[in-house]
From Swiss-Prot:
Short name of one Pfam family: T_cell_tran_alt
Extent of the signal sequence: none
Membrane topology reported for the UniProt record: Single-pass membrane protein
Top-level taxon: Eukaryota
A biological process term (GO) from this entry: osteoclast fusion
Name of the molecule in the record: T-cell leukemia translocation-altered gene protein homolog
Transmembrane regions: 35-55
Keywords attached to this entry: Membrane, Transmembrane, Transmembrane helix
Localization: Membrane
Family that this chain belongs to: Belongs to the TCTA family.
Primary location recorded for the protein, binned into one broad class: membrane
Record-level GO cellular component terms: membrane
PANTHER family: T-CELL LEUKEMIA TRANSLOCATION-ALTERED GENE PROTEIN
Organism: Danio rerio
Amino acid sequence: MEESWDFEFLSRMVDSLVSFLSEFVDDWLANDMRVAVFKILFSWLVVSLVAIHFAWKVYGNTVNDMYYRQGTGGQNGGTPDTHLSGWESAAGDAMKTHRE
C-alpha cells in the first residue's frame, strides 16, 4: 500500500517538474521581457561568482595571511586583548586576578 503512495507522490513531483520546465522553455523561446530580465540577472550572478572565484584564487592567500598573522600583538596581530569593559576602565580599578 505504501509503495503505491510513494510512486504516486514521485509521479506527481516529476509531472510538476516537467510541466514547469516545459513552461520555462516556452517562455525562454518567446523571448519576452521576463526572460530578458532573467537573462540579465542570471548573467550578472554568474559573472559575479566567477569574479569572486578568480579574486579569491589571486588574493586568497594574502587575505588568509592577514587574518591569521602571527605577532606579539593581539589575536590577529592588532592591539592586545584586554577584555576591559567601559566601567572598569573608567573607574581606574586594577584588574583582579585569581590567586591560589
